[in-house]
């Protein structure tokens, strides 16, 4: 449940990529 910059930039796609 973190919010890295990657998620903020790419949105949902970034969140999925961060989880993987």
UniProtKB/Swiss-Prot annotation:
GO terms for biological process: tricarboxylic acid cycle. Its EC number is 1.1.1.37. It catalyses: (S)-malate + NAD(+) = oxaloacetate + NADH + H(+). NAD(+) binds at residues 11-17. Disulfide bonds: none annotated. The keyword Lipid metabolism does not apply. GO terms for molecular function: L-malate dehydrogenase (NAD+) activity. SUPFAM superfamilies: NAD(P)-binding Rossmann-fold domains. Catalyzes the reversible oxidation of malate to oxaloacetate. Belongs to the LDH/MDH superfamily. MDH type 2 family. This is Malate dehydrogenase. It comes from Kibdelosporangium aridum.
